[in-house]
Every structure is written in C-alpha cells, then in structure tokens.
Design a protein with these regions (language model features):
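Contiguous mid-protein beta-loop-alpha structural module that forms a pocket-lining wall or clamp
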Residues: 180-183, 187-235
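Conserved CoA-thioester-binding segment of acyl-CoA-metabolizing enzymes
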Residues: 23-84, 390, 395
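C-terminal amphipathic alpha-helical interaction region
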Residues: 341, 345-395
Length: 395
C-alpha cells in the first residue's frame, strides 16, 4: 500500500489514519485551513498557514501534510514538492516553531489519547519526508525549531536565509530532541550533535550550512521568485534543479564563530557529569555560559538526551524514530518509571516555561549529579512489544 504499511501483514502502523488517507480524493477532506496545498505546473506546493502561532504543528496539520505527500508521491504528474511557512505579513518570514506544546500540556494532564496519536503520526510524517522518492524542497526562512526541523531535515534541499534560526530546544522544556533529532543530530561532525541536543543552541544560516543542517543559502528577498519559478521548470531536464539553484542561491555567509574545538573537547566526554566538571573548570565566557545554560534544564532529561544521541549513531532512521516514540511516551506517561503523573519532567517544564512562565521548574532530581543510570535506563525500554509498536511499519 505505502511505506507506512506493515510488510509483515500485521496491519498498518497507523491503521485508522491510513484508512482515511485511502479515501482521499482531494485535500479538503481534512478541513484544515492551516495547510494550503496546491499544484502549479508539476510541483505540489505546501504552505504552513498558522502564523499567529508561529506555524506550530497540530494533529490536523500533520494529517493534512501526510495526505498531500502520499497523494503526490503516487501521482506521476507531480515531479517535486516544496514547503514554506506563512509569516505575519504574507508568505515566508517564518517556517515552523515546532509542535503545539500548550496542547501537549493540556492533553497530558487530561490523559487525552490524542497526544499518543499526535506523536505517532508526526514521527511517521518525518519518516515519509526523509524517504520521499521525489525532490522535497524546504524553504526554511525565519524560525525553524523542533517539529519544524522534523519536516525539513529530511528534505532534498534545505534552503536557509539571513533570517533563519534553526534549533532543537526541547531540553529547555524537559523533553529531548525528537522528530528524528537523534538520527540527524548524531550524524553531524564531531560532538556537535551532543552539543546541540543538550544546549538547544540556535544556529543562523552560516553555521547551519557549515554543520550540515542546511544545504543552500538564498537571500530572503529572492524567495518569492524562486518559489514561483519552480512551477515553470522543465522537470524532465536532468539539470533542472541545478539551473534553478544557480539562478537564486548565494554563498552562505562565512561563519567563524562555531566553537567546534571546544564542543568536541567537552561534549565528547563520557558522561554528563564529566562534561559539567570540565565546563565549570574552564574560565572562558563560552564554557561558563554553556554550563549555566545546562544547569537550568532538567537534569534527568539532559541525561536521557545524551544517551539518545549516542544510541542513535548506531540506528537507522526507522529505528531511531521507534526509540523516540518510546521516549516520548515515557516523558508524558510516567507510571512505568515509578514517577507520578504529575512528576513528568516535560509537563513541569512546559508549565514553568510556557504556561505559568515563572521559569522556576521543579526538576526531579534537582541536580545533574543526582541522576543515576537506574533513572535513565527505563526510558529506553519500549512499553510495547515489537509486533505492537505504533511505528512498527516503518521500513
């Protein structure tokens, strides 16, 4: 049927959703005005249209994106797909700030099963994008955080501008870098993946290109013309995309500010405790600021994120997404971790940083040094048998 199907014959991993996709004859069936899907020439164009919420992803948006991509994947008249975000003043200027974390908080407190559906379907969408058989172009102008990275890092071309701000800031709210973050961060040079996962460091265009999180740099003023020109390309020509790129891209701004030697020296150390000891012994401003930033985050989830990145280096994309699906289940539903439902680090982090905004998260444990391996290990035990995993159908 499609790549979300279970080849073992045990059924689709997203059985209900896939049944709905099979009924699709157009895009209006999701009734999701927050995704604009249109065809011009041989290109399927997608626009995230929730600018007042920084284009944060909702479950209807994820379903609409998935429906469009599945339909266009199998349509011989569609040669490529392009995606952008709607800004406050029109197209571009903003890509996607991630998932709707206020919804996460409300759903977790209510025990709403829709939260489970959200992450299963979001991660399946991430896999679909990474494995998409046609060119998928992401116009990553403005904010590209969390879930925004999830729908752009698998792109054939990842285009950034002088306004781009890329990051995986999940540890700030007591989460971990999900949406395939374990996979794409762990494959960066040196210990950059550990650094970005733990600190949530935000990158501009130059550093993003230098680290391999973006491919091409366009000045923002060139985006409307570049977007429109895709519809006029002769996609049967072997050099169509190369010609298009040559007409619009510039060299990415040179960037000498990435502290890569320090990143490798500290974030390649064997444990989070060792990283902290080394950072706090270094009198440099960078080391001091980095240590202070880490001390503000959930000690437990910093340990989990470090373990996640290091495990992911040996995993395929599908294996990583299954691991992340396990992790996110543990983050929001904590009974199996011998923690009460109200002691979820993620729920507490969202409360402190987003809901109440008191910035006084009550992390448990409160200190990095008090986290034990026995606290971290259960996060990496799947709550599902392999034949019942919600992402078992990912190949």
């Amino acid at each position: 049927m499609d790549k979300l199907s279970d080849a073992s014959g045990q059924g689709a991993c997203l059985r209900g959703t896939i049944r709905e996709f099979e009924k699709c004859k157009g895009f209006g069936m999701w009734n999701c005005p927050e995704i604009i899907a249109e065809i011009q020439g041989r290109v399927g164009f997608l626009t995230l249209n929730r600018p007042k919420a920084l284009n944060a992803l909702t479950l209807p948006m994820i379903r609409a994106l998935t429906a469009a991509l599945l339909r266009w994947r199998d349509d011989p008249n569609i040669a490529a797909v392009a995606i952008r975000g709607m800004g406050r003043e029109g197209p571009f200027g903003m890509f996607c700030a991630g998932g709707d974390i206020r919804f996460f908080h409300q759903a977790a407190l209510a025990g709403d099963p829709v939260l489970e559906e959200f992450f299963t379907e979001e991660y399946a969408l991430n896999h679909l994008i990474h494995t998409y058989p046609k060119p998928y172009l992401a116009f990553m102008d403005g904010i590209v955080m969390g879930g925004g990275m999830g729908i752009s890092q698998g792109a054939s071309l990842r285009i950034v501008t002088q306004h781009s701000k890329l990051g995986m800031p999940e540890t700030y709210i007591g989460l971990f870098p999900d949406v395939g973050g374990g996979y794409f961060l762990s494959r960066l040079r040196g210990a950059a993946g550990e650094w970005l996962a733990l600190t949530g460091q935000v990158l501009g265009a130059g550093p993003a290109v230098a680290l391999g999180l973006a491919d091409n740099y366009f000045p923002s003023q060139a985006l409307p013309a570049a977007w429109a020109a895709l519809a006029d390309l002769d996609w049967s020509a072997p050099q169509a995309l190369a010609t298009w790129l040559a007409a619009h891209e510039l060299a990415a701004p040179a960037d000498n500010t990435l502290p890569l030697d320090a990143v490798d020296a500290y974030f390649s150390l064997e444990s989070l405790a060792a990283i902290m000891v080394a950072l706090e012994a270094d009198p440099s401003a960078w080391a001091s600021q980095t240590a202070i930033s880490l001390r503000l985050r959930s000690p437990l989830m910093l340990h989990v994120a470090l373990e996640q990145i290091r495990r992911a280096r040996g995993l395929s994309l599908a294996e990583d997404l299954r691991m992340e699906r396990d992790l996110v289940r543990h983050c929001f539903f904590t009974r199996h971790l011998a923690r009460s439902g109200t002691s979820s680090e993620t729920v507490e982090g969202i409360r402190a940083m987003v809901i109440d905004k008191d910035h006084q998260a009550r992390w448990q444990p409160a200190r990095i040094e008090d986290v034990t391996p026995e606290m971290v290990a259960p996060f990496f035990v799947s709550p599902w048998p392999s034949n019942a995993h919600p992402l078992r159908g990912l190949g």
